């Protein structure tokens, strides 16, 4: 087979250009990424050797080998893992595939240090090698294939694939280093980077180098060169080590390698259980949200091992989805090694491990919540996703309610439900909340006026998930939740009803509102809960479903709502006497637009609003 030339996808070209010309902040991470990829390939081969009958007799000792040539300025990373065939090479090294390249590019901030830290998190680690290499040669042979292939590229838009000769399965990557990066072809540089980032990769990493010694004395002294191969990492599964053997730095370094994250974790939970079930867990709470936190196709951050043998890193059932930000390891002594992913979903052992793990993680979050400053670091990136647990995790609902924070209208800050309850007024029977799309608009809502008169605080909820989960939360500590916009809540305020004579008085004006706004609203009602506001847009029909659709990224058609009017307001009292139909129509539209501004903060037809406003002003002057 002759060499076949391919062109990188557009996004890969952008990425390569970025790697080569921009991300210079932390070049050494390329080695961490390539070693991590090699470790993943070994994990996958181990799993296949357990589950594929054809591979059960394969005689191989998983390892990673590094070598270099300082004269030729090359560095080679070799593993005997699962390997790749031609289609794998095209998919993984030439196209976006599952690499997350597009998301990576959209997440870039322009800060080189921050951007370089994103490389591994977005699964584009292989391409980081182009930060130091002018050319890369990949030779690989898939464990299930007889044919090996070579992939070659200088990172300038194209790559070549050809057949090659390779006896053992696995992948060998040779980097032809740039002149300014030739120091990476050095024993001490490689050793230092591996110890910094890959000390606890659970496979041995060997470094081949030439050791120079001198023998003899005086004129007989001569230089003797000897090729050596040393293991340069511990190759220990850190989670299986005793806590007493580990320091904070060990946990931090393992996290950065495991999670492809240069930042330090907020916290970690290392737990070993012995008894009827035996398992070890090591979970990390990151300090920043992963890029795919709110994507349906998010990648699980937890790996499952059985007796230190990797099983899967793609099972979203290991932890509930509202804890998808957690990174870490579950290692069971009781699950069968050949367990399938289908069996995992119904396995009682794993269900027990999951249940206990959730409680451990929530307890750690509770510990963080004792310190407001630290808790803010957790809650800002992860508070929204934690709320999702209210919808599905009934077992831990009370604990989750304790951990959530809500914006208090009275205090002007985020508070716990416990704090809210401590400040309940003497006759207050409920916890009131108001839903909306924007916190600033909620603060200005006319609905809050009557609650303020009573001295009742209202929690302002502006996350899209709120309208989806809150209707399913009935109470906290025996105190019911009430939507402040609902009629039941307004009745609790003891508002005066609108008398029949007032309704008769406004009958014609309401009809005028309905005729002018027939394409915009569902109807018009007089309201007893408005004080200073003239008008208010009422509830959205099927608000729960609409917000669920927004959460899923679906477009939600504009639905018609009720317009509520304040019969006691001076403007409406004046409109009762307005006989100029054209002017009345302009006033009606201005009042409706004002109510829409309070609801949405914007108008879909600002031009017409401006024309009506100018017309009214002209007549008033």
From Swiss-Prot:
It is found in: Cytoplasm. Its main location: cytoplasm. Pfam families: HATPase_c_3, HSP90. SUPFAM superfamilies: ATPase domain of HSP90 chaperone/DNA topoisomerase II/histidine kinase, HSP90 C-terminal domain, Ribosomal protein S5 domain 2-like. InterPro entries: HATPase_C_sf (IPR036890), Heat_shock_protein_90_CS (IPR019805), HSP90_C (IPR037196), Hsp90_fam (IPR001404), Hsp90_N (IPR020575), Ribosomal_Su5_D2-typ_SF (IPR020568). Keywords: ATP-binding, Chaperone, Cytoplasm, Nucleotide-binding, Stress response. CDD domains: HATPase_Hsp90-like. PROSITE patterns: HSP90. Residues 342-547 are annotated as: B. GO terms for molecular function: ATP binding; ATP hydrolysis activity; ATP-dependent protein folding chaperone; unfolded protein binding. Residues 548-621 are annotated as: C. The keyword Ion transport does not apply. Residues 1-341 are annotated as: A. Homodimer. Molecular chaperone. Has ATPase activity. This is Chaperone protein HtpG. It comes from Helicobacter pylori (strain J99 / ATCC 700824). The lineage of its organism: Bacteria, Pseudomonadati, Campylobacterota, Epsilonproteobacteria, Campylobacterales.
């Amino acid at each position: 087979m002759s060499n076949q030339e391919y062109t990188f996808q557009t996004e890969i070209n952008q990425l390569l250009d970025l790697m080569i010309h921009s991300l210079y902040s932390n070049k050494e991470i390329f080695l961490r990424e390539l070693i991590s990829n090699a470790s993943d390939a070994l994990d996958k081969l181990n799993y296949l050797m357990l589950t594929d009958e054809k591979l059960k007799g394969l005689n191989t000792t998983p390892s990673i080998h590094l070598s270099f040539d300082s004269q030729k300025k090359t560095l080679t990373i070799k593993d005997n893992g699962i390997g790749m065939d031609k289609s794998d090479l095209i998919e993984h090294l030439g196209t976006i595939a599952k690499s997350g390249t597009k998301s990576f590019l959209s997440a870039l901030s322009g800060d080189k240090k921050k951007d370089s830290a994103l490389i591994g998190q977005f699964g584009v680690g292989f391409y980081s090698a182009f930060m130091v290499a002018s050319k890369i040669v990949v030779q690989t042979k898939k464990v299930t294939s007889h044919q090996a292939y070579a992939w070659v590229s200088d990172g300038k838009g194209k790559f070549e694939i050809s057949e090659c000769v390779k006896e053992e399965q696995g992948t060998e990557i040779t980097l032809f280093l740039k002149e300014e990066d030739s120091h990476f072809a050095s024993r001490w540089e490689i050793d230092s980077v591996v110890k910094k980032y890959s000390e606890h990769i659970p496979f041995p990493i060997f470094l081949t180098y030439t050791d120079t010694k001198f023998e003899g004395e005086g004129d007989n002294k001569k230089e003797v060169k000897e090729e050596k191969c040393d293991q340069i990492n511990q190759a220990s599964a850190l989670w299986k080590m005793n806590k007493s053997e580990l320091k904070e730095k060990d946990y931090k370094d393992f996290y950065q390698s495991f999670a492809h994250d240069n930042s330090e974790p907020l916290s970690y939970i290392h737990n070993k259980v012995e008894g009827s079930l035996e398992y070890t867990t090591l979970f990390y709470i990151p300090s920043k949200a992963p890029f795919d936190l709110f994507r349906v196709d998010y990648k699980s951050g937890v790996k499952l091992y059985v007796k230190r043998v990797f099983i899967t890193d793609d099972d979203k059932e290991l932890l509930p989805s509202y804890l998808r930000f957690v990174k870490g390891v579950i290692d069971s002594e009781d699950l069968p090694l050949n367990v399938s992913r289908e069996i995992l979903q119904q396995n009682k052992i794993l269900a027990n491990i999951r249940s206990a793990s959730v409680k451990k993680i929530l307890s750690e979050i509770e510990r963080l919540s004792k310190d407001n400053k630290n808790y803010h670091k957790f809650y800002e990136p992860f508070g929204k996703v934690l709320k999702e647990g209210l919808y599905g995790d009934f077992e831990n609902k009370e604990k989750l309610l304790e951990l959530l924070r809500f914006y208090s209208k009275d205090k002007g800050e985020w508070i716990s439900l416990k704090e809210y309850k401590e400040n309940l007024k003497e006759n207050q029977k409920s916890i009131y909340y108001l839903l909306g799309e924007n916190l600033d608009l909620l603060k200005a809502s006319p609905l809050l006026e009557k609650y303020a008169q009573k001295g009742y605080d209202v929690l302002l909820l502006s996350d899209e998930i709120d309208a989806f989960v809150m209707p399913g939360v009935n109470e906290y500590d025996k105190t019911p939740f009430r939507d402040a916009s609902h009629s039941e809540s307004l009745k609790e305020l003891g508002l005066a009803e609108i008398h029949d004579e007032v309704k008769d008085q406004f009958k014609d004006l309401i009809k005028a509102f309905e005729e002018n706004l027939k394409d915009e609203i569902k109807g018009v009602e007089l309201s007893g809960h408005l004080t200073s506001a003239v008008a208010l847009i009422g509830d959205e029909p099927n608000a729960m479903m609409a917000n669920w659709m927004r959460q899923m990224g679906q477009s939600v058609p504009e639905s018609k709502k009720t317009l509520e009017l304040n019969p006691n307001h001076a403007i409406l009292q004046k409109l009762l006497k307005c006989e100029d139909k054209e002017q009345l129509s302009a006033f009606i539209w201005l009042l409706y637009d004002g109510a829409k501004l309070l609801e949405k903060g914007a108008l879909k037809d600002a031009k017409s609003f401006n024309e009506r406003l100018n017309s009214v002003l002209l007549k008033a002057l």
